[in-house]
Amino acid sequence: MSDIVWHQHSIDKQSRADQKGQKPILLWFTGLSGSGKSTLAGALERALFDAGFHTYLLDGDNVRHGLCKDLGFSLDDRDENLRRVGEVAKLMVDAGLVVLSAFISPTRAERERVRALFDDGQFIEVHVSTPIEVCEARDPKGLYSKARAGEIKNFTGISASYEVPTAAELIIDTSKGDLATQVSALLDYLAAIQVIDSEKLKKAI
């Protein structure tokens, strides 16, 4: 490693952000399977994209088709999965993007390791706090049924614990209210912390 050095390029993160007219940031959606993480993150990205903002959504299932397809679901593999995602998200934030990620990420330690990669204010934890009863009733992939039947081991919420965030910047229960209202609340928050230009957003709505 002593022969590997970091190359400082002439175009930095702030220059890329200024070009795009936004504040680069990572919104980390965490919650149980079926809580609505991907749906909420996807709807928010659509609203931002349609308003002209530069975004990218990292989805827990999608990254396992390429970046993390060599990983299983052991504790070590799950840790490595999130480590890779965190590093990719860091590169995307450095590129000036508003990055959204939707991962169960069940432990506080995992989430804090990702947070530590970013400057203050660039990691926004969104706890999708939908109750497990609602998540299990939805069961869009049939995973809860398989977990209850013992077909899936170490399933978060059933046979493995989920550590509720203690200091999430935002908490959203998708069983309360409609998707449009929840996305609006997220947009209001992003405007309040000056990630996005509220006037630009208003023109697009």
Swiss-Prot record:
One Gene Ontology term of the molecular function aspect: ATP binding
Q: Which Pfam families match?
A: APS_kinase (PF01583)
The lineage's top-level taxon is Bacteria
UniProt: ATP binding residues: G31, L32, S33, G34, S35, G36, K37, S38
The function of this protein is: Catalyzes the synthesis of activated sulfate.
Active site per the UniProt annotation:
S105 (phosphoserine intermediate)
**Gene this chain is encoded by:** cysC
State the name under which the record lists this protein. Answer: Adenylyl-sulfate kinase
| Catalytic activity, as annotated | adenosine 5'-phosphosulfate + ATP = 3'-phosphoadenylyl sulfate + ADP + H(+)
User: Matching PANTHER family, A to Z?
Assistant: ADENYLYL-SULFATE KINASE 1, CHLOROPLASTIC, BIFUNCTIONAL 3'-PHOSPHOADENOSINE 5'-PHOSPHOSULFATE SYNTHASE
> What Enzyme Commission number(s) does the record list for this chain?
2.7.1.25
Listed under GO biological process in this entry are:
hydrogen sulfide biosynthetic process; sulfate assimilation
Q: Which UniProt keywords apply?
A: ATP-binding, Kinase, Nucleotide-binding, Phosphoprotein, Transferase
Q: In which pathway does it act?
A: Sulfur metabolism; hydrogen sulfide biosynthesis; sulfite from sulfate: step 2/3
Q: Which family does it belong to?
A: Belongs to the APS kinase family.
EC primary class: transferase
Q: Supply the source organism for this entry.
A: Shewanella halifaxensis (strain HAW-EB4)
The UniProt entry, under InterPro entries, shows: APS_kinase, P-loop_NTPase
